[in-house]
Amino acid sequence: MLLKSTTRHIRIYTAEVKNNQLIESNNVLTLDVDPDNEFNWEEVALNKVYSKFDELVESYNGEELSEYNLRRIGSDLEHFIRSLLQKGEISYNLNARVQNYSMGLPKLG
């Protein structure tokens, strides 16, 4: 059964992508970061999210693969993305389809 966790900026699936399709997997997690392009991402910041994801997944090694645990990982990644925004490592995409400033109003500097 396909398990998933979806937050505003993070989607995690127990699946792998093949031919633009999600194929269920018990061995692979797929991470989709900021699917609505709410933020401007530099490669360094995006790699930090991937590294944090790997770290969080490793911390659950040996535990049940459940929607609850996936939600915990997704929630932790949401907080991590907020910290990147607060540190100025990412910024809001002012050309995004919707501007809702879900992580707080932008800082004018």
Curated annotation (Swiss-Prot):
Keyword NAD (UniProt): yes
InterPro entries cross-referenced by the UniProt entry: NdhM
GO MF entries: oxidoreductase activity, acting on NAD(P)H, quinone or similar compound as acceptor; quinone binding
Reactions catalysed, as given in the entry: a plastoquinone + NADH + (n+1) H(+)(in) = a plastoquinol + NAD(+) + n H(+)(out); a plastoquinone + NADPH + (n+1) H(+)(in) = a plastoquinol + NADP(+) + n H(+)(out)
Superkingdom classification of source: Bacteria
Assigned keywords, A-Z: Membrane, NAD, NADP, Plastoquinone, Quinone, Thylakoid, Translocase, Transport
GO cellular component: plasma membrane-derived thylakoid membrane
Any single Pfam family the record assigns to this protein: NdhM
Bilayer disposition of the protein: Peripheral membrane protein
Record's keyword annotation contains Repeat: no
Enzyme class: translocase
Enzyme Commission number, as recorded: 7.1.1.-
Protein localization: Cellular thylakoid membrane
Subunit structure: NDH-1 can be composed of about 15 different subunits; different subcomplexes with different compositions have been identified which probably have different functions.
Biological function: NDH-1 shuttles electrons from an unknown electron donor, via FMN and iron-sulfur (Fe-S) centers, to quinones in the respiratory and/or the photosynthetic chain. The immediate electron acceptor for the enzyme in this species is believed to be plastoquinone. Couples the redox reaction to proton translocation, and thus conserves the redox energy in a proton gradient. Cyanobacterial NDH-1 also plays a role in inorganic carbon-concentration.
Family, as annotated: Belongs to the complex I NdhM subunit family.
Protein name per UniProt: NAD(P)H-quinone oxidoreductase subunit M
